[in-house]
Amino acid sequence: MMLSLPAKFEVFGAVRIYDVSRVLSLDGRPKSRPTNLVYVDRGELEDAAFRTVIVVPVKDEDLLTLENVLRSIPTESPVVVVSASTREPVDRFSNEVELARLISRSLQRDIAIVYQFDPAWSEALSGTPLESMVGASGRVRKGKGEGMLLGFIVAAALGADFVGYVDSDNYVPGSALEYSWIYYSALSRATSSYSMVRIVWPYKGKLAASDMYLRKRGRVSTITNGVLNYTLSIYKRIETDIIKTGNSGEQALTVKLGMEMNWGSGFAVETYQLVWMLENCYLGLQAGKCPIAPDYIEVRQVSPLNPHIHAERGDEHIAEMTAVSLGTIFHSSLASEEVKSRILDQLKSLGLAEEPPKPSTYRPAGTDPKKVFASFIAESSDSYYFAV
């Protein structure tokens, strides 16, 4: 794989954010030793794949779409499917379990499939720093962030050094393969043990009733990126546009970083990752709030060749995601009155007159992933780990 070098990076305390790198070739080999690009050979990709677990969150997705995504992930990487699918009037989760079983057998690959609302999570998380994930119902709370964190814990329990995320609603299976290769390339070459790579979609298309239109950026991302960059510009007194991935669901990180940072609930999860880094390891650095200091956090942003194409979600979904994403900034120490005013103006333009919600947060530090997963899988009658 060949990627362009980022044109620049910017430093915010102990956070180093790189500008966008682009995939130049999915399967190319330069004739001479390159100095103007990053070349990762097949051996390096394979070595990194064995160190990576790919997490696939799913909720009521078309089974064929999910199957194509799972079959596109390199077999060297174990897969963790975290399902929040409905079980009535049809038990969609049971279909996902059977699909995972068949793929595990046919491809001879390790797949864990866990149900987000499995009651076994309650006992497994009890007494750990993550017990607040369980609500009054005795089940893990609803939300994408909660599902991503459960997937991270399972991946860490399976021995991963790196954890990558691939959405299950992707209609272009080849993009799941490309994302995986990007994760392997970026994290295997990272210079910090506390690293993350976030995907910048080259195009984001939605399948509507008529034609498909490919946008350069998603509607929510455009707003979130703008507010984050505006916020950083105020602090640095220099205008910046360094953040291109405020709502990047396709991402990967080192287990060391994932265990140290806080995780946001629901749709807040992707934006809150950046907010947490900047709050604690930029503004809070001198006050001793950055748990990874004197090390630094490295954030890479990479643009793939494949577009991200999924089903149309509707304006209501877009407004909800925007409000939740901006809420992570609004309720943080990053937000000056000027920033809060801009956020409220953005929400008013979407027909939302109230302050954005403050997300719940979870901190896994001090949790033993292997102990949690062993307890969970022993108690569960619904979730499975198909190992070969």
From Swiss-Prot:
Compartment(s): Cytoplasm
InterPro entries assigned to the protein according to its UniProt record, in alphabetical order: Nucleotide-diphossugar_trans (IPR029044), Osmo_MPG_synth (IPR012812)
EC category: transferase
Primary localization: cytoplasm
Biological or metabolic pathway of the protein: Carbohydrate biosynthesis; 2-(alpha-D-mannosyl)-D-glycerate biosynthesis; 2-(alpha-D-mannosyl)-D-glycerate from GDP-alpha-D-mannose (MPG route): step 1/2
Origin superkingdom: Archaea
The keyword Glycosyltransferase appears for this protein: yes
Cellular component, GO, one term: cytoplasm
Record key words, sorted: Cytoplasm, Glycosyltransferase, Transferase
Gene Ontology molecular function, alphabetical: mannosyl-3-phosphoglycerate synthase activity
Annotated catalysed reactions: (2R)-3-phosphoglycerate + GDP-alpha-D-mannose = 2-O-(alpha-D-mannosyl)-3-phosphoglycerate + GDP + H(+)
Keyword Transferase: yes
Single biological process term from Gene Ontology: mannosylglycerate biosynthetic process
Annotated Gene3D superfamilies: Spore Coat Polysaccharide Biosynthesis Protein SpsA, Chain A
Known EC number: 2.4.1.217
Record-stated family: Belongs to the glycosyltransferase 2 family.
NCBIfam families assigned to the protein according to its UniProt record, in alphabetical order: osmo_MPGsynth
Function field: Transfers a mannosyl group from GDP-mannose to phosphoglycerate to form mannosyl-3-phosphoglycerate (MPG).
Name of the protein in question: Mannosyl-3-phosphoglycerate synthase
Organism this protein belongs to: Aeropyrum pernix (strain ATCC 700893 / DSM 11879 / JCM 9820 / NBRC 100138 / K1)
Name of the gene this protein is made from: mngA
